[in-house]
């Protein structure tokens, strides 16, 4: 255990995090080893941080063939494959933005140190805005495999996504984990789809204080802080945490938790009490259980989601409400939703039967009724 670089250690563990506890411990372990002069290999860092991918950047897929297409220029202008292998314009694409690994506001600034194992909310924001503003992008899919991360920047990104509802379909594809801060962001999307075996949740916020005062004393080391300002060095790791400091930290944690649960309730179309007293107590739930609890809308793979989205016909119009946007297509496993003739979708979202997947679910009145019944049942269970 190190007693070096106290401010670096404090910056990591004491600030509020919306992340699974094992991942925060992994981050702290990296800091500890670095402070002790132990260098980690790239593979070791990757294992601790999670995915090693260029995160927060949009990957584009043709909305007619689902082939991945290239990006030309700084805006989203795409070229596909023409005859003889020559470039051919692609009229409509689906933008898939990856949110992998640990989330931080400026994670891109440390990519050169530890590899692209995290996701920057700022980078996701830029990619999202570009995709939203480009007429060639018919839908946006945020693909999640993240344990969460630091709370900073998460609420801003979630608000940006939520405000964009109704402009074009925005889908969260959980492939295979959206925990804590990742779920905060996902809940702002029109729809949450969980891949089979995937997990969502871990709604909560926490901080960590590590008291190494006795360890330092055992090593014959004493630290004396010279500071101005009553609370300037409050919570440092070389002194036990006082009751006053604990209360201040708890108040901050509670405030972030209120923001978190309020945003989730808004995004999922339920009451805050449904979240706080129900699925928002910190547990992670698996695919179909999450759907049953109202944490997600359906279970499907990324490929299935892309095919379904490709078969949708979108039109511009005023922002739709939570019950009439993508949720208009009920979960495929819903037993009490008999098929009926398709009707106009008030959100402007329709299904075209001559594209890719003729079996894709259509937006029907009974589908909407089934979704509302599930939502009412969820509200009834949770008071």
Could you say what each language-model-derived stretch is?
Residues 1-383:
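N-terminal organellar transit peptides
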């Amino acid at each position: 255990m190190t007693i070096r670089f106290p401010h670096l250690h404090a910056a990591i563990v004491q600030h509020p995090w919306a992340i699974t506890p094992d991942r925060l411990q992994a981050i702290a372990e990296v800091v500890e080893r670095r402070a002790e002069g132990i260098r980690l290999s790239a593979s070791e860092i990757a294992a601790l941080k999670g995915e090693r991918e260029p995160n927060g950047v949009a990957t584009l897929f043709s909305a007619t063939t689902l082939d991945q297409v290239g990006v030309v220029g700084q805006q989203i202008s795409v070229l596909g494959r023409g005859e003889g292998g020559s470039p051919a314009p692609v009229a409509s694409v689906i933008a898939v933005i990856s949110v992998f690994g640990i989330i931080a506001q400026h994670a891109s600034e440390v990519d050169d140190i530890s590899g692209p194992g995290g996701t920057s909310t700022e980078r996701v924001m830029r990619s999202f805005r570009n995709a939203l503003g480009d007429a060639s992008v018919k839908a946006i899919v945020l693909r999640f495999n993240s344990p969460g991360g630091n709370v900073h920047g998460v609420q801003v990104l979630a608000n940006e996504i939520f405000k964009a509802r109704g402009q074009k379909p925005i889908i969260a594809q959980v492939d295979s984990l959206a925990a804590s801060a990742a779920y905060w962001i996902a809940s702002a999307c029109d729809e949450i789809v969980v891949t089979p075996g995937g997990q969502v949740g871990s709604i909560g916020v926490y901080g960590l204080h590590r008291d190494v005062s006795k360890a330092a004393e055992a090593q014959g080391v004493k630290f004396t802080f010279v500071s101005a300002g009553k609370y300037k060095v409050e919570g440092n790791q070389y002194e036990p945490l006082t009751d006053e400091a604990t209360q201040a930290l708890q108040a901050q944690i509670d405030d972030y938790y209120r923001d978190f649960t309020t945003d989730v309730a808004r995004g999922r179309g339920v009451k805050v009490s449904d979240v706080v007293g129900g699925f928002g107590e910190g547990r992670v739930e698996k695919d179909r259980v999450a759907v049953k609890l109202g944490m997600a809308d359906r279970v499907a793979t990324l490929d299935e989601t892309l095919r379904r989205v490709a078969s949708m016909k979108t039109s511009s119009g005023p922002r739709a409400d939570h019950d009439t946007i993508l949720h208009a297509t009920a979960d495929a496993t819903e037993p009490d939703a008999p098929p009926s003739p398709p009707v106009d979708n008030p959100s402007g979202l329709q299904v075209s039967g001559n594209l890719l997947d003729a079996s894709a679910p259509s937006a029907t009145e009974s589908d909407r009724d089934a979704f509302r019944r599930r939502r009412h049942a969820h509200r009834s269970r949770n008071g």
